[in-house]
Amino acid sequence: MPITVNKLRHDTHHFFYKKIGAIFFISIFATFMNILIDMFIKPDMHIVSIMENNKFINTSSLLEFIQNMNLNEKHELLKYSILKIMESLISKTTLLGSIIILISVVSEPKKKSIVSSIRTFFLFFPSLFILNFLTTFIIQIGFMLLIIPGILLSIILSLSPIILFFKKNRLLDSIRLSMYISWKYIKIIGPGVLFWMCGKFILTMLLAHFSLINKNVLFLISNISMNILFSILIIYLFRFYMIFLRS
């Protein structure tokens, strides 16, 4: 079966509208999990206010800001940053794992029970979390160097969570295969990832102009919308990999 962008777009559109209720529920659940973790973190409000009120133009301005901190403030900033990274990874892994399990359950001819699906999710979660940490770290290094390497790394590593699901806990193999397959089919994988990135950018720009809306409500809308966008990307990539395995 030939793999085309139009075919994947049609299949993604069909699956999204068929399972729109479940996707919305997962997106909302991941958002509320993010909020709950944020409540338990309880960071130093002085550090949070400093971070929110300072607009860093570049890396040097951020480094200068950190250098002017006292030792206690640096320690609190480090702790806050680590906790926020963990929060983001847990939320992303929950969303990613849930959507992958949802697609796999719907795609299988033999229907799985809810208990079986939850069990699969919890078995999959630890390895997916580690993979997310590794790929996020690699991609962020790419963005720190230049924008183009960051985008390219986002594309070639995008299949790794889906390959991991099929390969069953083989992290390095998942990353290696993702790089090989995504590079070979970059004209098909690329548009999906770029659509997601552009969607995130446009959504961020639009929501930034809604200054009259309550900050917490805006955060909720933003997170749910971003989660839905990411879910669409995962559906697109999962469908690609299913067709790839059959071809």
Swiss-Prot record:
Membrane topology classification: Multi-pass membrane protein
Protein location: Cell membrane
Superkingdom in the source lineage: Bacteria
GO CC annotation terms, alphabetical: plasma membrane
Main location (coarse class): membrane
Segments traversing the membrane: 20-40, 85-105, 114-134, 137-157, 188-208, 218-238
UniProt keyword Coiled coil present: no
One Pfam short name: UPF0259
Alphabetically ordered keywords of this record: Cell membrane, Membrane, Transmembrane, Transmembrane helix
Keyword Transmembrane tagged: yes
NCBIfam families assigned to the protein according to its UniProt record, in alphabetical order: PRK02868.1
Family: Belongs to the UPF0259 family.
HAMAP family, per database record: UPF0259
Protein name: UPF0259 membrane protein BU276
Organism: Buchnera aphidicola subsp. Acyrthosiphon pisum (strain APS) (Acyrthosiphon pisum symbiotic bacterium)
